[in-house]
Amino acid sequence: MADDRSSNMANDSSSNTANDNPSVTTTLYEPDPESYVQFQREIYGSLRKPKYSTKPSEWEAAARNAIPLANFLYVFGAASSESTHAANRSAFERYRLRPSMLVQATRRNMSTELFGKQYKSPLLIAPIGVQEIVHQDAEEATARAAKALKVPMILSTAATRSIEQVAKANGDGDRWFQLYWPKPQAEEFTASLLSRAKANGFSVLVVTLDTFQIGWRPNDLDESYLPFIWGQGCQVGFSDPVFQRMYEKQQSEDTRTVTEKLQEVWQILKRPGSLSGAAKVLSHASIIPKAMFFTGLVASGNYRDWNDLQTLRRLWSGPIVLKVRYNCMSCGYSSQIPGDTNRGRRPQGH
């Protein structure tokens, strides 16, 4: 009898709680309609195969077949013997997920706070340059996807779209700006880039510290392929008023005669060793010198030191992230300016 009464009272109490607080069940036990798992349900619900495989292991082969080999190798390759890249992959694969059972995970919270701001995703889209060589929509497509998924996007200085174009495509999404730091003699150019980024809603500055010159990348060298020469990956610079002014000044100071300039053009036309190569050079005749000028500013071989970070602090009022692999000696210097670090060993190997 006592057990029955206790059972009835428990049932009544549970019933009253549910009736009195109907929102409790909804809030705690109904799956999030915006959860990423919805993509899985959409695939099954479509009753047809997805356009692309859901297996990341198959994407590499698919990309190799879809785009020119030189373009693929530029994205795929790493520096030197690529041993550091392989070691990083191996280390990452040793991480394991350790799920907990019988815990309330219907409404999972994967949000994280960075620099005082809450983000829905603990992941960010890394700064990947020259995206136009793999898809015609380039960084604008990435910006739209980042907004739709509510994942922060980091725009590369080596983008094939301008700062303003990417900001427009990203709308009210979260976006950071990665800086390939121009040489000290072009500080006005650096200031202009950061001013444009700030004005277009980029909230965090990510400074790459190990690419003051183009890395030794055997795949690209064997193909003699550098997209920047053809103007791809230079759009952030080409769209900058200070850069344009600097380039025009450089051109106006060129005192060579017309004959000397034509001789240079002729020598360049002969370099590819084929008519098709010469035709490509000729079609890019106005772009190549401008592209080389941009590359000379952002990959000049002029290295910075820790004291130069104070310059960035003056030019940028928001958070600054240092993107590099530290050694122990560097840690003492870096403690003076807050930052985080990570690098995928594309430009350097060890």
Model-based region annotation:
Residues D3-D4, N8-D12, N16-D20, V24:
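Asp/Glu-rich intrinsically disordered low-complexity tracts
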Residues N19-G116, S224, F228-W230, P241-A285, ...:
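An N-cap/entry alpha-helix motif that binds or orients negatively charged groups
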Residues A79-S80, T157-R161, R325-Y326:
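Short beta->alpha linker loops
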Residues S80, S90-L97, V151, K198-S203, ...:
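Generic secondary-structure signature for well-ordered alpha-helical cores
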Residues R96, S111-E113, P122-A126, P152-I154, ...:
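Short, conserved beta-strand segments within well-ordered enzyme catalytic domains
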Residues Y119-A158:
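Glycine-rich active-site/cofactor-binding loop and its immediate structural neighborhood
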Residues V130, R144, A169, K183-H350:
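Alpha/beta enzyme core
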Residues A148-T190:
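A gly/proline- and charged-residue-enriched helix-loop-helix capping module
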